[in-house]
Amino acid sequence: MAKMTTLKMKERLEKELNKPNRQFAYERDSDTLSVTQNGKKVTLAIPQIIANYENDGEAAIEKIIYYVEEGFLAASGNIELKNNTANIYPVVRATSFPDTTKAGEVLLTDEHTAETKIFYAFDLGKSYRFIEKNMLEKEGLSHEEVRKAAFDNLGKLEIPLKKDSVNGNDFYFVRTNDGYDASRLLNVSFLQQMREKLTGEMVLAVPHQDVLIIGAIKDNTGYDVLAHMTMDFFADGLVPITSLPFVYNNGKLEPIFIMAKNRLKE
């Protein structure tokens, strides 16, 4: 495979995503390509896409195209919340994630941890749209009604687990690719069940939108493996969240910083 450069990837993306109503803008300083359609903008980090391309080949390009097309489709449609609350889910994002749209509309959010924030989304099948506060006002819904519906729906999602073990440390992965893998971190009853089931310290990570990692950590090797694993997932994700894992104690999530062979608490 010929080496993919920034210029080649930029040109490839512009060719694949080109449509009459779209504009492209390349930012050299941040090495990003912005795609704008009808006032809606998607920003693509080219180095990350190149890294994924080197690992996955054409599948990485296809995934980006799908992500952009579905994103614009979701942004362009009108949604009705009141009679479709079964389609509302909570979504985890980094605290740095913008809480307003490009048009200046404020998104519906809740506080979560020092590293994460809860947003609310309306599921569209292959994608979802973030819920804005003005949507609630138009339909006469309260924040609490949306929150309750979202968490009720989250509790109905299946949570298939894949297990791996390293030197007595057990790791469980949730990777359904339904858009809500990281959201399972918000399922309190699931976390409580896992805490009762696991031995060792229970540590969780949501490096990006499409994975939840749960570790039953027994020693420094376990922390070391989790740290490397979380960083790898964080670098590969289309929607990164946080590279910091969380210790789960007494029903609370506390971010921790882990260095190789060592665990440094808050």
Curated annotation (Swiss-Prot):
It comes from the Bacteria. The lineage of its organism: Bacteria, Bacillati, Bacillota, Bacilli, Bacillales. Belongs to the UPF0354 family. This is UPF0354 protein lin1649. Signal peptide: none annotated. Coiled coil: none annotated.
